[in-house]
């Protein structure tokens, strides 16, 4: 099964120049802890509620701070034609719960996949594999803790 068959296609994004206040409002409205940061059609980063609450606040940054100043620029992603099990393993290895999905053709953002999406798919055992890896101590934890 391809990841495109279980990913969420309608994804809210923020731009690097938007203030973190707007990113936080989007997250609150969408009940999401992570948002892709896009410049035009290109994914340039991810911003998490943790980036806003911990990094920005700890550094004394205000609500008008541009997202680019606190986002993670080293983004792990998958392609829409990747197999669900392969993506679950990638999520497990990196210890992330969500991953942006790009088009292989032009590398534009086409969706986001979460453990919940995978668990509701026909490949629900892949979610168990990912969850086991995510809950193990260690790993990269670069996008969502």
Task: Name these PLM-found stretches.
Residues 1-26, 32, 37-38, 43-44, ...:
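Bateman/CBS regulatory modules and CBS-like beta-alpha motifs in cytosolic regions of diverse proteins
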Residues 16-17, 49, 120-123:
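Generic alpha-helix initiation/capping and coil-helix boundary signal
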Residues 44-48, 52:
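Cyclic nucleotide-binding regulatory domains
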Residues 53-65, 118-132:
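A short, polar/charged loop-to-alpha-helix boundary motif
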Residues 110-112, 116:
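Hydrophobic alpha-helical segments characteristic of transmembrane helices
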């Amino acid at each position: 099964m391809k990841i495109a068959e279980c990913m969420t296609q309608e994804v809210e994004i923020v731009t690097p120049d938007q203030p973190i206040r707007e990113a936080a409002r989007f997250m609150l409205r969408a009940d999401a802890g992570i948002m892709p940061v896009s410049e035009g059609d290109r994914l340039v980063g991810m911003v998490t509620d943790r980036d806003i609450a911990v990094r920005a606040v700890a550094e004394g940054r205000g609500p008008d701070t541009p997202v680019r100043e606190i986002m993670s620029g080293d983004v792990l992603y998958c392609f829409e034609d990747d197999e669900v099990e392969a993506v679950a393993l990638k999520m497990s290895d990196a210890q992330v719960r969500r991953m942006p999905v790009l088009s292989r053709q032009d590398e534009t953002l086409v969706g986001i996949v979460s453990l919940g999406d995978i668990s509701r798919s026909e490949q629900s055992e892949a979610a168990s594999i990912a969850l086991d890896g995510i809950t193990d101590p260690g790993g990269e934890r670069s996008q969502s803790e």
